[in-house]
Amino acid sequence: MSLYALLLVALGMSMDAFAVALAKGAAVRMPPRKIAATALVFGTVEAFMPLAGWVGGFYAKPFISEWDHWVAFVLLGGLGLKMMREGLSGEAEDVRESKQESLWMTVLTAFGTSIDSMIVGVGLAFMEVNIAFAAAVIGMAATVMVTIGLTAGKAFGVLFGRRAEFAGGLVLIAIGTWTLLSHLGLIQ
């Protein structure tokens, strides 16, 4: 696989994470340090998933391709509904939110946006590619795209407040629904 092709794959794999980061950045105020930490979590998970897929290879492919869209749909849909509910409630998020809960939600969201990367890893198992390098490139692309998404979302969120959280929830549900419908062959 050429470097150009790998960069395109990495960019494609990071687009779901970018959309989620844009929504999250609009909904929650994050200091630069938190943006960097969140981007690193997404990048790490996004880099790990193709490695896991590569290791699983063709043994996991039938199971993963059969259920990945349902997992993404449930995770992103559930997170989206939670964000919409919070956006409608009008209650400000508790600034003293538990660090463990915050980390858990970040990891869960990162996992939900990177399931397709695992399938890419399965495909990479059948190609001439340095999987460690490919995973690093995919992880770095996700880190950069999440940083951009959170930063751009932060500027957007200042303008639109709680409505942005509701819209962010809609984005998550749309991503999950699109993933499900495209895997079922109902849309392209």
UniProtKB/Swiss-Prot annotation:
Isomerase in keyword set: no
Keywords, comma-separated and alphabetical: Cell inner membrane, Cell membrane, Ion transport, Manganese, Membrane, Transmembrane, Transmembrane helix, Transport
Membrane topology according to the record: Multi-pass membrane protein
GO MF, one example: manganese ion transmembrane transporter activity
Source organism superkingdom: Bacteria
InterPro entries: Mntp/YtaF (IPR003810), Put_MntP (IPR022929)
Listed Pfam families: Mntp
PANTHER family given in the database record: MANGANESE EFFLUX PUMP MNTP-RELATED (PTHR35529:SF1)
Protein's UniProt name: Putative manganese efflux pump MntP
The species this protein was found in: Neisseria gonorrhoeae (strain ATCC 700825 / FA 1090)
